[in-house]
């Protein structure tokens, strides 16, 4: 077997059970991985120097194909209401079949950290069949120094083989595509898909399992910090604006998607960003555009000009879920430490497909826990297979597919941290205004940015608020530079009766969804629920 690159020779492929490999490329950097991806026909080069790959059939995550081993370790610690199980025996069969499938292959291996805080990070080794997948995960996780690689012993190991085809009868899964996690052995198996985001989210899922026991709240959020050291957290599902809104030229970016919140503050799990880039433009998102049109960026399913090879970010013919992965260093004002102090503001982003939520509202701590557990948004086109237009969705903790433990574990931790650090909480609608999806229009990003700036710099504390008659939270009545009518959603609708009907419908959906949590929360949180009786008064 031919091995090239820096690694710990005493802890190689044999420790994972890999044998009869043709070769291993260890910890290659971007230039080498570009060369292999291009030589192997895995990807092409854009005119700007980005590496552009197609992910084939799977252009998004496939949550129904994700499984966790149910054993003595997980029986009473996993949230089985939200996770699918396989037996330890089925996983072992799958694992051995993965090892057999890898024989004769040349694999790419990366030794990386999941987490910027040395106390809580997890040492992660990722074996990939494809060179561009190796570049992707190297970009998204945190890269050790060269000297650290020579003694690196992984705690978590992923193997990613897109050419593997699972057998549902033999392996206990649903289809030929599979993501299987064994928390006791700290192994993740990914097969049958070329969608690179499965790797990143598998590491996130493992951190979501291990960190609460260490007193750290893992979060599906972005984070940034202002010039005065004021940290802000942005919760939200894919496509709601986490990446876009946290990339603020006046604030330092900590990270765009995954963080932990513990005794010393907030830390990024990652070393890169993974931005949706459909309709990406230099005018609306200059930093993300610049990071996506340069050497080192990995573009997924982006259409290139036939002759000039220029990315056409407006073309969603392959998928609406076009993506750009780039290192944090590509953002001019990104924090390279990936760490910041205790948050002063928590923002919950919702893409309201009904168009009845205000562009911003202030939440009490109880309302914050209610909306965190509710996790309301719209599923935005393309993030998952089969979703082509926004549909209302409740995804608890703004990340249901990635929660191994019961949502109340994360909800209670958030409430305690908000109270302990006296954090201001906001709900921001980045969805629709002027009508329901299809008749209204998307909230202007400039309005959202202006309102967020006012919230984060403290100026929103000094304005007059009204109580929303449907949702009960506090809504500003006026703010300089923002049209006052957009602050009150009913004023943006031509048909006021239709607004009332739609708002009541959404309130009912909130109540129906939250019923499953009522036994796990106290009276104060239950009282924070939206209530149609308010609207009738």
Curated annotation (Swiss-Prot):
Binds 1 Mn(2+) ion per subunit. Mn(2+) binds at residues 201, 220, 257. GO terms for biological process: gluconeogenesis. GO terms for cellular component: cytosol. ATP binds at residues 201, 220, 236-244, 285, 323, 448. Keywords: ATP-binding, Cytoplasm, Decarboxylase, Gluconeogenesis, Lyase, Manganese, Metal-binding, Nucleotide-binding. Its main location: cytoplasm. Its EC number is 4.1.1.49. Its cofactor is Mn(2+). It catalyses: oxaloacetate + ATP = phosphoenolpyruvate + ADP + CO2. It is found in: Cytoplasm. The keyword Manganese applies. It comes from the Bacteria. SUPFAM superfamilies: PEP carboxykinase N-terminal domain, PEP carboxykinase-like. One of its GO terms (molecular function) is metal ion binding. Pathway: Carbohydrate biosynthesis; gluconeogenesis. PANTHER family: PHOSPHOENOLPYRUVATE CARBOXYKINASE (ATP), PHOSPHOENOLPYRUVATE CARBOXYKINASE ATP. Belongs to the phosphoenolpyruvate carboxykinase (ATP) family. This is Phosphoenolpyruvate carboxykinase (ATP). It comes from Rhodopseudomonas palustris (strain TIE-1).
């Amino acid at each position: 077997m031919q091995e090239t690159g820096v690694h710990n020779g005493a802890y190689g492929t044999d420790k994972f059970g890999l044998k009869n490999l043709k070769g291993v490329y260890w910890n290659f950097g971007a230039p080498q991985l570009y060369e292999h991806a291009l030589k192997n026909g895995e990807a092409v080069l854009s005119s700007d120097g980005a590496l552009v790959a197609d992910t084939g059939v799977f252009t998004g995550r496939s949550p129904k194909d994700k499984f966790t081993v149910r054993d003595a370790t997980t029986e009473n610690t996993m949230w089985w209401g939200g996770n699918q199980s396989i037996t330890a025996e089925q996983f072992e069969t799958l694992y051995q079949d993965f090892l057999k499938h890898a024989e004769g292959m040349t694999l790419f291996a990366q030794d990386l950290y999941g987490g910027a805080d040395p106390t809580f990070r997890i040492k992660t080794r990722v074996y990939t069949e494809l060179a561009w997948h190796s570049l992707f995960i190297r970009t998204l996780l945190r890269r050790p120094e060269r000297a650290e690689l020579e003694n690196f012993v992984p705690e978590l190991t992923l193997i990613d083989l897109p050419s593997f085809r699972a057998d549902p009868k033999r392996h206990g899964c649903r289809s030929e595509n599979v993501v299987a996690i064994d928390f006791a052995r700290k192994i993740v198996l990914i097969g049958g898909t070329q969608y690179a985001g499965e790797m990143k989210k598998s590491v996130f899922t493992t951190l979501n399992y291990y960190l609460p026991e260490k007193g750290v709240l893992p979060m599906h959020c972005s984070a940034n910090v202002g010039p005065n050291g004021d940290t802000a957290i942005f919760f939200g599902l894919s496509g709601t604006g986490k990446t876009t809104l946290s990339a603020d030229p006046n604030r330092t970016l900590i990270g765009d998607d995954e963080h932990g919140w513990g005794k010393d503050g907030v830390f990024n799990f990652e070393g890169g960003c993974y931005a949706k880039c459909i309709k990406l433009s230099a005018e609306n998102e200059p930093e993300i555009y610049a990071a996506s049109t340069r050497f080192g960026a990995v573009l997924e399913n982006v259409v290139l000009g036939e002759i000039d090879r220029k990315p056409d970010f407006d073309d969603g013919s392959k998928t609406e879920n076009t993506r750009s992965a780039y290192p944090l260093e590509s953002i001019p004002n990104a924090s390279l430490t990936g760490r910041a102090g205790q948050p002063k503001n928590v923002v919950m982003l919702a893409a309201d497909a009904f168009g009845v939520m205000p562009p911003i509202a202030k939440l009490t701590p109880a309302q914050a826990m209610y909306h965190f557990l509710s996790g309301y948004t719209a599923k935005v086109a393309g993030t998952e297979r089969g979703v082509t237009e926004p549909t209302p969705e409740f995804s608890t903790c703004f990340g249901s597919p990635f929660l191994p433990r019961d949502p109340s574990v994360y909800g209670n931790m958030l409430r305690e941290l908000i109270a302990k650090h006296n954090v201001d909480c906001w709900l921001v609608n980045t969805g629709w205004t002027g009508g329901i999806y299809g008749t209204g229009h998307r909230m202007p990003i400039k309005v959202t940015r202006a309102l967020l700036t006012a919230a984060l710099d403290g100026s929103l504390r000094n304005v007059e608020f009204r109580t929303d008659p449907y949702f009960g939270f506090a809504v500003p009545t006026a703010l300089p530079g923002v049209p006052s009518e957009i602050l009150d959603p009913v004023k943006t609708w031509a048909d006021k009766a239709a607004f009332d009907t739609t708002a009541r419908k959404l309130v009912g959906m909130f109540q129906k969804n939250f019923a499953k949590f009522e036994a796990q929360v106290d009276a104060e949180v239950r009282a924070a629920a939206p209530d149609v009786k308010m609207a009738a008064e």
